[in-house]
Amino acid sequence: AAESENPKKYIEDKLDIYCLPCKDEKIRLDMIYTYLTAYRDRDLPKEALEVLQIFFNVLRARKMKIMLRFAYCDSFLALETGAGEANIARHIQQLRQLVARNADVIHTLQSGFVGAYGEWAPCYQMPPVNYYNVLWRILHELVFPSGLYYQLRLPTYKNYINDYKPYYDRIGIDSCAFFGEQTREGWESEGFQINGELKEDWEQLTREAAYTPQDGELFVNVNLVETKRMVDGKEAILEMAHHRFTSFSCWHGYK
């Protein structure tokens, strides 16, 4: 395949295509999904780590930074492509030096490894894993040693390690279900809002958002159109202000 014959050119071509609609904006920050699907039941081979290093080199040459998310399953219709906890732990260990070596081009690490798209939606993780164990490994192996910040789907997950402040203080949020600061019933979609079941998450982020980078994206665009759940501009501004967003994608999946 072309990507294996000349990975550097393949990566550069893909970045060019991906960034073409935004070329006049001189993009310096992007969100990247790195799928390890082919290795979900075995170690990462040397060649995979080498290709990832080439990718980081290309970013460095282009003076870009990324929000980096490792994942296995790229569809909630293919949950069987997820990885088990033992292999997740092994891959995190294998990626430790790579992440540390390239921390200068990583804005944040995001969620990752668990669930469809690495989003940490619990209903989409197969086989089941211990979320606390995975979170601790990510923070202990990838985030803290590299001096990076980490972003999780919900403050609820952040609270898993609220008894260890050095790690807790490195965690922000990547909201995969942004609807603005509104009170409509049933709009959570496994996110959190100002008056929903996870109201405490909303209030917690309002208190803590100033101290870590926050990121978000609109909910699935097709779904928004079908359900007529269109985000109000003023409500969007209010949420971004109160939760102090550092970055945001107006198109779900960062397209």
Locate predicted features:
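The substrate-binding groove and active-site-proximal loops of carbohydrate-active enzymes
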Residues: 35-47, 76-86, 115, 119-128
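Aromatic-lined substrate-binding rim segments of carbohydrate-active enzymes
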Residues: 16-21, 28-73, 148
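Non-catalytic accessory regions flanking glycosidase/transglycosidase catalytic cores in CAZymes
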Residues: 1-27, 94, 100-101
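Catalytic-core regions of glycoside hydrolase
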Residues: 105-255
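Short, flexible loop/turn elements at secondary-structure junctions
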Residues: 34-36, 70-74, 99, 113-115, ...
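Extended hydrophobic/Leu-rich segments
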Residues: 7, 11-15, 31, 35-36, ...
